[in-house]
Amino acid sequence: MKIFSQRDFLWILPLSLGLGAVLSSLQLGNWLIGWLGFSFLFLLSFSLLTLSTKWANGGGLPLRGLRDTPLEKRSGLLDHQKPLAWMVILAFTLRFVGGVVTYLALPVYGYVDDEDQSAGFAYTDAHRRDAQAWDLASSDLPIYDAFNKTYAYDQYGGLLAFSALVYRYLSPDVHRPLMLVLLSAFMAALALPFLWKATNQQWGAKVALASGWIYALYPESLLLGGSAMREPYFWAFSAFALWGFVNFVNRTPIQSQETLYSRVWLALGIGGMLLLSPIVALATIIILVGWFYISSGHGRVSWWLAIAVVVVFIAGLFLLSSALDRNGELGGGSPIGIINNFMREAVKWDVYQLERDSGWVQKLFDEMPEWMRLPFVTVYGIFQPVLPAAFFEPTKLIWRIIAILRAVGWYTMLPALILSVGAAAGQSVESKRRLFLWLSFIVWMWIIITALRGGGDSWDNPRYRTILFLWQAILAGNVWVWWRESKNAWFQRVFAMELVFLIFFGQWYANRYIHFGPQLPFALMVICIAAFWAVIFFWGLWRDRKRSV
């Protein structure tokens, strides 16, 4: 089947050249060099996105689960020939345009005294890594120097090396940060066709549609996907690995060529993650090993597969420990010991920073037993970014808009992730139930670990959490389908619990910043929230039991 034709170039080529001219005009340096560099990146991005979208959509073949749906009932997003293309278009456009607008607006409407914002960067890590990438690209040093400890702002070196490579050969005259913004948007969008194809094959069209739209439109991923960060690359490599694994697990004995393709995509995904962050590769391996164990019916595993997993896992441990302990100060004596020491020291530091930077947290820490501090930091981290704070904390307009969008996105996603366990338990097929329970367990373990690692930071915490966003989108998509089919009342009840939390905390923040309403002591407010939650929870149990009688 031909999935890419010369007709595609009739729009790809002129659009790439036109957008390349616009981007080159927005950046300093020789216009012709910038135009050629940007045009090449646009041409590559549009070609690969078109190719992968057509491939994932099967050239217009019906989605699994929609074949028997009458044509007159397939409207809007249920038309199998429309949704994936629109997802990819919106995913790329929103991230790229948002990244360009942020880059141009922050030096004007942000905090101009801030070094990162005055340079057009929303993330400090992105700014520092970008600056070091340009320094390396404009020097006489080899690109692989990105992996030594001289360049400390990229802990693992992979993205720094790639960024320097782009600058050295596509922007040799001047520093053009928008090239990396373009590549981030491209990588984020490239994950969608693989996510779509894998979820459609594994769970059907409805989960594929819901997961795809959540992935395409989630605000935190829009901001990260429009920045020169590692997360968009994580999502793309995770999607490659997901598709390779799903295709491998669901292959038939006579599909030897499919087995080869599956191994290639799986290796590409895991290998890419190892270069960017070994810990993400290790987390993905754990997810897929558990998945394979569940799908194989606890049967025997081939020797080559077991050896490959063990070798890659051990290599990942060594890469991670060496990256974390570049200066040899953590000790531990082994990769696991080094990683354990790093996590312990990192959590201590984050708790200290949270207490130091917030007067009311200092007050709460003074009033609570010491054993409660770590659980408090964990819960506080899970609720970051706090939606009421986004409305009331004093800041610039551009940052208020960004904060509200990020918080609304998380507080929409959070109930779905809470319900993911219930949705998994409600699956009629045993293997499907076990698989979604496994994915829910891993995602929530990751959320808790990142809440500890990021503390109460409203930027690092959500960013760490979003590293496994691809899997969160799958869980949330399954919850949406489960609720639409079952009309389970716990969907509304969990949202009601969240509404109670937002009302109380909204009033607390309103009193703190604009002196609106009475001031409840923090402990009393928590007790009130817990009481309302208990009423909703036990009333829900009573209603369910009454209906079942």
Language model features with spans:
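Short hydrophobic/aromatic helix or loop-helix immediately within or flanking a transmembrane segment
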Residues: D125-D173, L276, Y380-G381, V386
